[in-house]
């Protein structure tokens, strides 16, 4: 494989892209993180966190910064407020972590993720930048993107591309 500017380009900087940025930074992998939005979305979408998420985050050393609360159960109600599906979380294994399922407030979770990802010198984070094109040849990913504010266009390359752009 030929030399590239980055090892990985991360397309999207929501919860999955933020997690990738933190893990790539933790392992010293040179990454370019791109997202068309400058700021995090202010409303929650992802709201739960299980033991698998917690294991991944343990590597990033910021678990104490994330505010979580335990889920005791769920009671889904119809329009007349009658219970139609009730689930209790009693008896779920905790896998030596806090609890198997926790509630999170995603905007706060995103902010903690992003602040932590900045500390890794191998991360280049460019929010407010939109990917224009991606192609791959001879084991190299070529990417062009532009700064949405200035319109300035850039070209770069990497060994890998992680598509973390979610619903966008």
Question: Where are the language model's segments positioned?
Answer:
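Beta1/beta-strand and adjacent pyrophosphate-binding region of the FAD-binding site
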Residues: 2-16
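Short hydrophobic core segments
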Residues: 10-11, 156-167
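Active-site-adjacent segment of FAD-dependent monooxygenases/related oxidoreductases
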Residues: 43-116
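Short beta-strand segments that buttress and anchor functional surface loops
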Residues: 143-146
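Glycine-rich FAD pyrophosphate-binding loop
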Residues: 25-45
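A short, Lys/Arg-enriched amphipathic alpha-helix followed by its capping loop at the start of a domain
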Residues: 20-29, 120
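Core beta-strand elements of the Rossmann-like FAD/NAD(P) dinucleotide-binding domain
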Residues: 4-6, 150-160
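A conserved short coil-to-beta-strand element within the FAD-binding core of flavoproteins
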Residues: 127-141
């Amino acid at each position: 494989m030929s030399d590239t500017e980055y090892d990985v380009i991360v397309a999207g900087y929501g919860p999955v892209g933020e997690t990738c940025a933190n893990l790539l930074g933790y392992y010293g992998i040179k990454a370019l993180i791109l997202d068309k939005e400058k700021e995090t979305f202010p409303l929650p979408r992802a709201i739960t966190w299980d033991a698998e998420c917690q294991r991944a985050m343990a590597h990033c050393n910021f678990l104490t910064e994330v505010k979580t609360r335990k889920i005791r159960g769920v009671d889904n109600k119809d329009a007349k407020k009658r219970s139609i599906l009730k689930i209790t979380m009693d008896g779920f294994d905790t896998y030596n972590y806090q609890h198997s399922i926790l509630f999170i407030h995603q905007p706060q979770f995103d902010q903690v993720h992003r602040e932590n990802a900045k500390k890794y010198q191998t991360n280049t984070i460019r929010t407010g930048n939109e990917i224009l094109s991606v192609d791959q040849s001879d084991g190299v990913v070529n990417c062009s993107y532009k700064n949405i504010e200035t319109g300035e266009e850039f070209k770069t390359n990497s060994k890998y591309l992680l598509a973390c752009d979610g619903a966008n």
